[in-house]
């Protein structure tokens, strides 16, 4: 063996052109790969040849068995139960039994009232149920279960499209289960599309579509009439008369136009008349015979209206009296104001007259003084 190792470690430079080109060195393999080397003992006559002709190397890959979150080896093969970051695993990782368990667990939560769309907590519960069933080779995560359900839904839509195109019933094993879970929302759409696309005798398809339109429009008209009658019946009119005077016949039903009646009555399914009609006005019995609860409510409302009417009447009377008092007070105030103005005018006139008299007295005094002075001067001159 030592001679063999020496022969392998020293290649012949002269024979490098004659020997075939050595293959490139293999890449670094992971720890789970095993390399087996086989060395043949060289023959005496072929000692001058390259040792690469006698050395063979074989790489054996051992399967990497990991848990549910394995990331895969270096050769690009992902682990059996990936973490879900790469799309949640491939479809071939789900067996038929595992898919059945998944659909049942998902359907139980999907059909619960108020759920509709599952949250992350519900998907985790579904994943736990699938893992406990031990139908999967590797554990599944909530993201893988959600992606698998999306794939199953797409498959169901494809099968529905095939049925609508006339390929016959579906042979898919999970079709009936999904039809019971989510088939109610798509049955009407698929049937309408199939009736539009498939001719089915031409005139027959057109007559059915027109009949469906007439029936839909008729149902809308009936619904509007019911809403109108309901709103009219809630309008209660109370009067302050006796029971015999307050009784009145209900208004006749509005007659539909010929076009609406013809459209609202399809030939196959005629619209049934209403079973009862609520009166627009409530008949109030003041005798108090202890009837139904509606009569008690009506009597209570009637008493309330009478009390309210009395209060309003008293309020109007009080307001009229207050208005009279206000007008009387305003009249008195106006008279007092006029009296005050008259008094003020009299005082002003008196002051003016007093000033005039004082002015006249002053003028007279001045005249008298002048006369006295002139008389004295005349006496002195004559003397």
Curated annotation (Swiss-Prot):
Superkingdom of the source species: Eukaryota
CC terms in the record's Gene Ontology section: nucleolus; nucleus
Motif extent (Bipartite nuclear localization signal): 228-241
Low complexity bias: start-end ranges: 263-274
Pfam families assigned: Myb_DNA-bind_4 (PF13837)
Biased segments, Acidic residues type: 246-262
UniProt feature, compositional bias: Gly residues: 66-88
Sequence ranges of Basic and acidic residues compositional bias: 226-235, 356-367
Keywords, alphabetical: Coiled coil, DNA-binding, Nucleus, Repressor, Transcription, Transcription regulation
Disrupted-gene phenotype: Reduced growth of leaves, petioles, stems and siliques. Delayed flowering.
Polar residues bias: start-end ranges: 206-225
GO biological process: embryo development ending in seed dormancy; regulation of DNA-templated transcription; response to auxin; seed maturation
Coiled-coil annotated spans: 304-365
Domain Myb-like: start-end pairs: 94-153
GO MF annotations in UniProt: DNA-binding transcription factor activity; sequence-specific DNA binding; transcription cis-regulatory region binding
Primary localisation category: nucleus
Region (Disordered) residue spans: 1-32, 61-94, 189-295, 346-383
Function statement: Transcription repressor that binds specific DNA sequence such as the GT-box-like motif 5'-CGTGATT-3' in the AT2S3 promoter. Negative regulator of seed maturation genes during seed germination and seedling development. May target GT-box-containing embryonic genes by competing with the binding of transcriptional activators to this promoter region. Contributes to the maintenance and control of seed filling and may repress the maturation program during early embryogenesis.
PANTHER family named among the record's database cross-references: TRIHELIX TRANSCRIPTION FACTOR ASIL1, TRIHELIX TRANSCRIPTION FACTOR ASIL2
Protein name: Trihelix transcription factor ASIL1
Organism: Arabidopsis thaliana
């Amino acid at each position: 063996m030592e001679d063999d190792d020496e022969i392998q470690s020293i290649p012949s430079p002269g024979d490098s052109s004659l020997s075939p080109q050595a293959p490139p060195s293999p890449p670094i393999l992971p720890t789970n790969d095993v390399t087996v080397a086989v060395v043949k003992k060289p023959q005496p006559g072929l000692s001058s040849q390259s040792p690469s002709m006698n050395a063979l190397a074989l790489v054996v890959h051992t399967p990497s068995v990991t848990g549910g979150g394995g990331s895969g080896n270096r050769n690009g093969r992902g682990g059996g139960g990936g973490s879900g970051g790469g799309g949640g695993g491939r479809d071939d990782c789900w067996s038929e039994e595992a898919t059945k368990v998944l659909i049942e667990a998902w359907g139980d939560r999907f059909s619960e009232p108020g759920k509709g769309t599952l949250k992350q907590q519900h998907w985790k519960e579904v994943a736990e149920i699938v893992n406990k069933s031990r139908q999967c080779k590797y554990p599944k995560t909530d993201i893988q279960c959600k992606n698998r359900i999306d794939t199953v839904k797409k498959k169901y839509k494809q099968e529905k499209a095939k049925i609508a195109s006339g390929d016959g019933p579906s042979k898919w094993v999970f079709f009936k289960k999904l039809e019971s879970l989510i088939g109610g929302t798509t049955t009407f759409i698929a049937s309408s599309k199939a009736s539009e696309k498939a001719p089915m005798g031409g005139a027959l398809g057109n007559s059915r579509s027109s009949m469906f339109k007439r029936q839909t429009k008729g149902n809308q008209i009936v619904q509007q009439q019911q809403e109108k009658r309901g709103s009219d019946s809630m309008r209660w009119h109370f009067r302050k008369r006796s029971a015999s005077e307050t009784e009145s016949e209900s208004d006749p039903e509005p007659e539909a136009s010929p076009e609406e009646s013809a459209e609202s009555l399809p030939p196959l399914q005629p619209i049934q008349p209403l079973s009862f009609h609520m009166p627009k006005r409530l008949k109030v019995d003041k005798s108090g015979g202890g009837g139904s609860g509606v009569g008690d409510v009506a009597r209570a409302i009637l008493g309330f209206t009478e009390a309210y009417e009395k209060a309003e009447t008293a309020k109007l009377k009080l307001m009229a009296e207050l208005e009279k008092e206000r007008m009387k007070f305003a009249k008195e105030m106006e008279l007092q104001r006029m009296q005050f103005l008259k008094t003020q005018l009299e005082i002003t006139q008196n002051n003016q007259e007093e000033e005039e008299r004082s002015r006249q007295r002053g003028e007279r005094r001045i005249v008298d003084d002048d006369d006295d002075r002139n008389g004295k001067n005349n006496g002195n001159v004559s003397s």
